[in-house]
Amino acid sequence: MNTKISEHTPAMQQYLTIKEDFPDLLLFYRMGDFYELFFDDAKKAGALLNITVTARGKIRGKPIPMAGVPAHALENYLAKLVKQGMSAVICEQVGEVGKGLVERAVTRIITPGTLTDENLLDEARDSILLSLFCFQNNYFFAYADITRGDFQLTMGLNEQELQSEIERLRPAEILMPETANVPAFITALKPHRQPDWYFDSDSSYRLICEYYQTTTIDGFGIAPDDPALSAAGCLLQYLHDTHKYHLPPLKPLQKQHDHQYLLLDATTRRNLELEYTLNGESKHSLIATINRCSTAAGVRTLKRWINQPLIQHEYILERQEAVTALLTHADLDEIAKTLRATADIERITTRIALQTAKPRELAQLRDTLMQLPAINALLQTSAAHSPLLAAATQALMHCPQLGDLLMKALVEAPPLTLKEGGIFAAGYLPELDALHELTDHSAQLLEKMEQEEKAQTGLNTLKIGFNRVHGYYIDIPRSQAANAPAHWIRRQTLKNSERYVTESLKTLEERLLNAQDEALALEKQAYTELLITLDKQRDDLYRLATALAESDVLTCFARLAKEHHYCRPQFSNQIEIQITAGRHPVVEQLSAQPFIANDLVLHQKRQLLILTGPNMGGKSTYMRQTALIVILALAGSYVPAKEARIGRINRIFTRIGASDDLAGGRSTFMVEMTETANILNNADEHSLVIMDEIGRGTSTFDGLSLAWAVADHLLQKNRALTLFATHYFELTALVERHQHGANIHLSAAEDQEHIVFLYHIEEGATSKSYGLHVAKLAGVPQAVIHNANAKLRQLEEKRVPQRAHQALLPIESQKPSLSPQIKNILQQIQEINPDELSPKAAHEWLYQLKTLVRDLDKNEL
């Protein structure tokens, strides 16, 4: 669009002037009953929303592209845009519609990370706005969920740690400096570039102090030169840009510390399918499978707890004690039923602060507040045995006066929007009641005035009427005009009657005609005042919302434990994981067959387990269930096992499955080695490592050598608790030579034609993978199976056990053999006594030695 604004029509000039302030956002421009988009915005909207792109007028002979959506359907279209990561500006008609150009102004800015509208948010997900800043090769970021008031900073992260946090948070929107270079995985998320000055450290510090109305941030426990403050400053500036009238309420700024939570990198999160399965769906993920929550806020809290398990045992035990107390003393079904009737207080509280809460949401808040005594009663007995539940019940008692206020203020079923009116209950506002009396009983009031005038004048034939020209009037026959009182004012003379008005009739007319507008204005003012009153209790409401959500998750854990016979895990200060009859929490619920439970023992004297067994025998399931049991335990849940004992585990690593990275230009094997390198460089004795079939992406000897070296490194250097699944039977020799390793295998039974997977862990190794049996089960043609069997027998006959055994000995035990020539040279050197050699003899000996070396075969050097 290379035209001057002055070349356009007045309406289009107005559009372009507003658009200049929002070049990267889609501008929805209100024109009558539609919101219109023009030029490139129209083309983008047409593609994104699947709407028709037409034209409206021309400029320099070329049509101006235009697309539009009906005003009543705007929210549906905005929801579609937000799901695609797009942002939009809503420009409304704010002036009177009449002659000339209608005044318009931007009333809303919609971006994925700053949403608070109920119909645009996913109720089951946190809505994260993240601001990213790079300083001295480390990444610092601030993130906020304005729907719940959270505002956090992170420590400096490397690229892998950043990717892990992005995977955990899954931000709705990312902000970053205009000129910054970032990893490819950030670029793929389409971050919104912001001016570099938004990240200026001094400006950011001032902006944070202004927001919290302080002169320093020392009270937050954050250093004034912390680079993450630059990210926080940008985030606040962005909120200023998108919320011009009311800034979202944010709780005091907090800094997140690694030592509080179990570290899970992005690969591990994906491999363990915590929130999404490997195909990208939430169904059949761990969270979806264990979710028994009754509220949306509970689901969001459950996701946070599973995605960020605790590692400090005292806090985990608080949750455990609450689950135990609920299991022992509470009616879990009744608690769940009562919680289902509660509203999303967390998000309603934010909308109250922003003055965007709808009347119906206040009614939901009222009804929830009225439910609190019942919820409290259901939790009371359990709370006596749990400090966490006791604190929750205290929080539930903070807002009784708000419930009483809303009961008095609101009608039983308020309208959806404020402009519909009829929000407040009778008796709450006497002035409003009087206006409603006017609008609801106008006919009776006119009838009453008519009777009063008849009584005062004796004119029994007078009537009060109305027309659009003259409004309300008193009508009497012309024959009685002489008897009209002096204070009557003649309005109109007709053939058979005279029409008059009185001051009282004009006053009543004005009141009747204006009553509805006055009532709406009064309701709007009273509604704003009600929101301000409610917002004064914001902190109490947030605490109440947290108490309800956490009680919901704890009840979810208790119901899950009761339904599926989970046990309460024990914790120790040792480095260990010991599980008796452990089960996979997802597979056991999805399988129609009884799940085969298995034991696991890992500790400092049994650090690494080489796991062998048949394809499809359950190796991956066994390893994943171990990691999931640890995560559930650290989240505060009971676990699917008969017994479990978890030591000091601070981090989980996984290397499972095979996939390439086409976008990043990495082969399957390169991905495998990158993930392996991450584990070898970062795992320590407090880590749980899951390794599945290392080395299968290359040649047999390369793969076997790598697998051996990796396992050896994990045993001797990392000393992490490790499950190492492999089809290289030769690896079983490694742990036979190392006192801190052991072999285990998954058993199977076979005859000549069939195999039965027993899915049971046994001590020791197995040399068979039963790959041909699995191929047969998969439907591979019989001729191929026959040829494969023949080739297998041929290869097994050619196997040289001694050579394979020698190849896999530890490097230090493999002594190279020397040729006779080298042995001869070494022997001659050993026989020389340097002290007895004359200079001439020494010189001759050097020449002789040089001749001997020259005669050696080059391959023997």
Curated annotation (Swiss-Prot):
It holds the Pfam family MutS_III. One of its GO terms (molecular function) is mismatched DNA binding. One of its GO terms (biological process) is mismatch repair. Keywords: ATP-binding, DNA damage, DNA repair, DNA-binding, Nucleotide-binding. InterPro entries: DNA_mismatch_repair_MutS, DNA_mismatch_repair_MutS-lik_N, DNA_mismatch_repair_MutS/MSH, DNA_mismatch_repair_MutS_C, DNA_mismatch_repair_MutS_clamp, DNA_mismatch_repair_MutS_core, DNA_mismatch_repair_MutS_N, DNA_mismatch_repair_MutS_sf. GO terms for cellular component: cytosol. It comes from the Bacteria. The keyword Secreted does not apply. ATP binds at G613, P614, N615, M616, G617, G618, K619, S620. Belongs to the DNA mismatch repair MutS family. PANTHER family: DNA MISMATCH REPAIR PROTEIN MSH1, MITOCHONDRIAL, DNA MISMATCH REPAIR PROTEIN MUTS FAMILY MEMBER. This protein is involved in the repair of mismatches in DNA. It is possible that it carries out the mismatch recognition step. This protein has a weak ATPase activity. This is DNA mismatch repair protein MutS. It comes from Dichelobacter nodosus (strain VCS1703A). The gene is mutS.
